[in-house]
Regions:
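Short, small-residue-biased leader/transition segments that mark boundaries at the very start
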Residues: 1-4
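Beta-strand-turn-beta hairpins that frame and shape the catalytic cleft
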Residues: 22, 35-41, 131-140, 152-160
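Binuclear metal-ion centers of metallo-dependent hydrolases, dominated by the metallo-beta-lactamase
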Residues: 25-27, 118-134, 213-273
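Pre-active-site segment of Zn-dependent metallo-hydrolases
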Residues: 33-72, 76, 80-88, 166-195
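Active-site neighborhood of phospho(di)ester-bond hydrolases with catalytic His/Asp-centered motifs
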Residues: 42-44, 67-81, 97-101, 161-164, ...
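Active-site environment of divalent metal-dependent phosphoester hydrolases
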Residues: 48-50, 76-81, 104-108, 130-132, ...
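Active-site HxH/HxHxD metal-binding segment of metal-dependent hydrolases
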Residues: 59-131
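Active-site-proximal loop/helix segments of hydrolase catalytic cores
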Residues: 145-222
């Protein structure tokens, strides 16, 4: 268990309300599980062997059958979505799914894979630039610069942002025209969050971008009020987090970035949060 930066929380506590119990588990890659007082939110879970050439080891914990669980999938890529999560409805009758509309689950498709088509009644499909209310969750979606959506979610007095694949994807060889278009689209979306409170954010820091690994992360930190930011989409290489924090001259900005060391790492929020 890692208790998140009590000193930072102490400095900042006058700026925000106490939100009660919150615990976060980094499952793997871009999957995070958020436990609140009366519910569990799970973002972009997939089984660890579904991505070719990778073996992710994170596992979802078990809960009481009547637990309220909300599973988010930002888009259909194999490292963000796994059809088998729909089978969890057999174990948890109070589960609800929030899926980007690019995820296709027709009744015929579900039946073909041995999943009860009735599970569709537990799915809310979302599109970019919209707002949704699911039970007591308020959800705003942003448009990804790759596929699907990013999620801004508020519940229990907590504001969360999960970027999905929304990032400043600058690739060598893509050319200035394409990279510039992606950057403008990315910044346009992130600026929609500039006036939003964000207690916790999950944002890409992809080492495959090489020298551009931190560009999107920089812009996100500088243009939002996110208090704790978890790097993600790191393909099991977490070395960039320490490097990035050392590069930041502003200590308070560096303190906002959470250091992840391993899959299934748990982060408990202290009393002052």
């Amino acid at each position: 268990y890692t208790t998140l930066f009590r000193s930072f929380a102490e400095r900042e506590k006058k700026k925000r309300k106490r939100v009660g119990y919150m615990q976060i588990i980094f499952i793997h890659h871009s999957c995070f599980l958020v436990e609140l007082d009366d519910k569990v939110l799970i973002f972009d879970y997939f089984d660890g062997d579904k991505v070719e050439g990778m073996h992710f080891t994170g596992k979802l914990p078990s809960y009481e059958p009547d637990t309220k669980i909300y599973m988010f999938a930002s888009h259909s890529h194999k490292d963000h979505y796994d059809m088998d999560i729909l089978r969890l409805a057999d174990k948890y009758p109070n589960i609800h799914y929030i899926f980007s509309k690019d995820i296709r689950i027709s009744p015929h498709f579900l039946s073909k894979h041995g999943i009860d088509p009735a599970v569709r009644d537990k799915v809310t499909f979302v599109s970019p630039d919209n707002t949704y209310h699911v039970d007591d969750l308020d959800i705003m979606t942003l448009r990804s610069t790759d596929a699907g959506v990013a999620f801004y979610v508020t519940s229990n007095g907590v504001s969360l942002f999960h970027a999905g694949d929304l990032n400043d994807w600058e690739w060598d060889g893509a050319g200035d025209l394409i990279n510039g278009r992606v950057r403008r689209a990315f910044r346009h979306e992130i600026k929609k969050l500039s006036e939003k409170p964000i207690n916790v954010a999950f944002f890409p820091m992809d080492p495959k971008l090489m020298e551009y690994q931190f560009k999107g992360f920089d812009f996100f930190l500088q243009n939002t009020s996110a208090e704790f930011v978890f790097p993600m989409h790191m393909w099991q290489d977490y070395s960039g987090i320490t490097e990035y924090k050392k590069r930041l001259s502003n200590k308070e900005m560096a303190d906002r970035v959470i250091e992840i060391e391993r899959e299934n790492q748990t982060f408990a929020f202290g009393e002052n949060y």
